Amino acid sequence: MAKDKDVRPIIKLKSTAGTGYTYVTRKNRRNDPDRLVLKKYDPKIRQHVEFREER
């Protein structure tokens, strides 16, 4: 019984560095209706880079 229009869906954040590294988190659709962009640590290249929401 998956909730298709859940208020807090699970999303994947994918590294923009092209390493393929991902973070999995939840977001609130009411507060952040646009795609999420966060600066997080990518251990494959040992740097902080932007991670973008992947749908």
Curated annotation (Swiss-Prot):
Pfam family membership, one:
Ribosomal_L33
Its family remark reads: Belongs to the bacterial ribosomal protein bL33 family.
Q: Which UniProt keywords apply?
A: Ribonucleoprotein, Ribosomal protein
Q: Name one GO molecular function term.
A: structural constituent of ribosome
Instruction: Report the GO terms under cellular component.
Output: cytosolic large ribosomal subunit
* Biological processes annotated in GO: translation
The protein's name:
Large ribosomal subunit protein bL33
Q: Which InterPro entries match?
A: Ribosomal_bL33, Ribosomal_bL33_CS, Ribosomal_bL33_sf, Ribosomal_zn-bd
The record, for PANTHER family, names: 54S RIBOSOMAL PROTEIN L39, MITOCHONDRIAL, LARGE RIBOSOMAL SUBUNIT PROTEIN BL33M
Output the superkingdom of the source species: Bacteria
Q: Which SUPFAM superfamilies match?
A: Zn-binding ribosomal proteins
The organism is Paenarthrobacter aurescens (strain TC1)
